[in-house]
């Protein structure tokens, strides 16, 4: 245990999260400047941001990986993670939220709540992360505070608690009014200077009182102390109101709302104050639940330096200068550089080499780290995303991080033998870093196939492979990751018999198969009676069944959501072996699937397009031509928001086509929604194409 510079109650582990282009990275850059972590303000358009440090991020002006940094404000230690807003990089948000205590959700004051805002909100709700909201870009034409509040209530089903209102809007935006004391704040100025203040304009007094009354009423609905004072007609002092706001925020009963413009330096200092005032410290979060890897019993760890060490690895980065960096969140105990740790996920001892506190891609070496901290380490060779690190004498296995399955793939071929070696190494490192990036080698075609969450996702990873690992490779066109399923019950026998002199081969298994609900996955049931098949042979048959389902039966795509019941079989004392039963299992499942009315499932994407009203008809027409289904059309003051679904197979090239249809004036976001049955005629074309390979 070490002497802390900042007590645990003054530590904040927070994420800056939002839709792409809402201003997350700009907000983070202002925070770094105001907390004196940087001496000049980074600019996305100039590619000078601290947090977007990868070449692909600077070139594209978007955040791809979750960059971590530490900052200090008003006697508090802040660990800040800036997460990507593009849906293809949702995994980065997922793993960040798993280890954070609180979130700052940034909204674009013009666009309001956008598609990825909803996705991120759902992710944060799933992990129970308390949040505060910052309505950004209040200086932009079309910014509307009240409309954004309405969208937070309607689209996110969240109870908002306005703690500020904007004074002015668009070009007249002066700053904001604090509804606790009616003080008004303008420019943040430099780190050393106080925030500019001004008097509440007389014309805004009535509006400010209305919003304050709303805030008190909403607070009273969720907090007993405020309700008592409210019913008694008493005015609570500001400190008691702030304590009540903190209580409802930590309980996720209501969301404090702030506003400003990060780009114009208004509202960020007060936002930092709010992070310290209302978001949780590691002491405020519930004890981490886990299991004893030896007994399977439920155990927990409280946030304390005196409890046994436990941590969750949430990110792997291949640093070109120092090697393999593993980021982890310490939930209990402490760890020193050079000490040992136990990876309970893999049952292996690991050595903590150097301990590092990260500032985007800059490294600060430290001697030790305590409960509640987010740090990185060099030297962990066999630790991967989602693994638990702990004290071997008091082991615990924490809940892993769940990631979505990839929906798109493409083939990649190295130009030379030396490129093959570099490509293999590069793909392995990229797959270690990104759990939604998968690599498979196709034995039949001899191709390496990579899988990801979308076109941009694979584009960025291929760019990194070519530039960081100096690989010269040919890249194929993106392809859809279809799935196979069955729609009927069927029964079949698989009998593998070989006799060619000497000892033969004999395996015989009978199975029944039936469809399961979407997302239920694969299930195997042993209903073999009277020892007709010995246990080890049945397991071999099941292995053959599973392998065949994974490679596909109908069109060469993985088969999902199927229940397999082994009902009968036979074996030979001399000729039966596990390999023969593996072949029999494969034969049985192929025969059964052929009778079970197989279908193809295709990934369906949820799409949100924002377009000027005059192009609305063209955008809808284009979506209809792609087998799209329109869910809603919502007009707003300057644009129309079209929400719908479209098959992934029909979405390739949509960026270019939308730009063409709207003369570059529309934007869109797309995310995976579900797998659905593919229309028969189109499915037949895919099956026939697969048969010609």
From Swiss-Prot:
Locations listed in the record: Cytoplasm
N-terminal signal peptide: none
Positions annotated to bind GTP: 18-25, 82-86, 136-139
Domain of life: Bacteria
Keywords: Cytoplasm, Elongation factor, GTP-binding, Nucleotide-binding, Protein biosynthesis
One of the record's GO molecular function terms: translation elongation factor activity
PANTHER family: RIBOSOME-RELEASING FACTOR 2, MITOCHONDRIAL, TRANSLATION ELONGATION FACTOR G-RELATED
Protein name, entry field: Elongation factor G
